Amino acid sequence: MNREKTLVKNTAILTVGKICTQMISFFLLPLYTALLSTEEYGTVDLLNTLVSLMLPIVTFQIEQAVFRRLIDNREKDEEIKKIVSTTVCTILVQIIIYVVLFLLISPFINNDYKYFLLTNVMACIFSSIMLQISRGLGDNKNYAIGSFITASSTVILNVIFIVICRFGAYGMLMASLSGNILCSLYIFLVKKIYKYISIKKWDKQLLKTMWKYSLPLIPNAISWWIFNSSDRIIVTYFLGIGQNGILSASYKFSNLYITIYNIFNMTWTESASLHINDKDASDFVSSTMNVVLKLFTAICFGIIGFMPFVFPIMINEKFSDSYYQIPILMLATLFNVMVGLLSVIYIAKKNTKAVAKTSIMAAIINLIVNLGLIKFIGLYAASISTLVSYFAMAIYRYVDVQKYVKIKIDKKFLIVAFIMMPILLISYYINNLYLNIVMVLIVCLYA
């Protein structure tokens, strides 16, 4: 099977596993925003934000190393046992250290939800490790099923805990915890991970090699956390937890969009890693990037174009201020797509230091712009800082990766896209019914 067919096949498998439940979760947004207050919604979002910060710090990003290492050793059973054993044994020790430190610090944390920061971090670590082992072994089918179990069980339990039991924020956090536990158990049993685990197979030298790959990804992950999550903390501090709930609702549309891209990105990472040293690698990368960028630009413009019609249906009126942040976050996420396409080149070349460097620079830009503007323009500071930093990182990475592969982006496409962008934004904020209909028709023609 050639590279393109393999890429399409793997993407299709992962899409079935992820997009269905993501769509269900998305369409339950009116339910969540109706039954939860902005404060409750903001609290859940803030705790999930802290969980995402703790993950790379606790794991040293070793789940990324196990995936990359397994790709090169799929046919070597003994090497697989060594990689899995080293990863699992190491992560268990790291989790024990995290538990001890948390229990020492917890008496000083005055929050009703604090223990979810312990349990949800542990559950997310195990599900992430299991999923990356499955993916590293080339079993995208079970990776997709595991992801489906996480998402579907979380959605179902959210409905039970929030609608029936009326547990509020506790319900959402318990649902997330349960979903990750079920995913971990599924992969562990179906893939028979226990057969690969032996303390005797733990390898110190291998661990050093894996950490050499994964440690530079920690600042990268924290930088991504700054992009995606520090906004919430800054907004909560300066504007209040209710405004964080508004921002969280704004992100739901761009989060769905980037989820669709991330499904492709997983298979794109694998494909690029396998073929980065081919003679025609530059042509392969360029053609793939152009097709994907055109597709996701059309999707982005389509979401913005239809948003004036969809928003009143999807979002409760107490979250109405989130309307104004959505197009800015959508455009920021479009540049994030470009960043993701380019970052795969670094991963394929095992140059994780370059990934970290560019991410840190952009994260600093994000913080400076956000902190500099939030007192003057309020919630807009969070979305604008995200847009500026993603744009800066996309431009830098595009120039920087040329030393590995020569990438050419269709100039005609770029010109049309940059003409469409301001026209679409003007129409969105004027929010005139007839003008919105015209823009939807133009977007459809563009697509």
Which residues does each PLM region occupy?
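Interhelical loop/hinge segments that connect adjacent transmembrane helices in multipass membrane
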Residues: 1-3, 7, 115, 169, ...
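Membrane-interface junctions at transmembrane-helix termini in multi-pass inner-membrane proteins
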Residues: 69, 124-147, 330-361, 401-405
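Transmembrane alpha-helical segments of multi-pass transport proteins
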Residues: 362, 410-447
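Alpha-helical transmembrane segments of multi-pass membrane transport and lipid-handling proteins
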Residues: 23, 58-59, 64, 85-115, ...
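Helix-loop junctions and terminal segments of transmembrane helices
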Residues: 29, 58-75, 250, 254-290, ...
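Hydrophobic alpha-helical transmembrane segments
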Residues: 145-193, 361-365, 379-400
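N-terminal membrane topogenesis motif
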Residues: 1-24, 78, 141, 145, ...
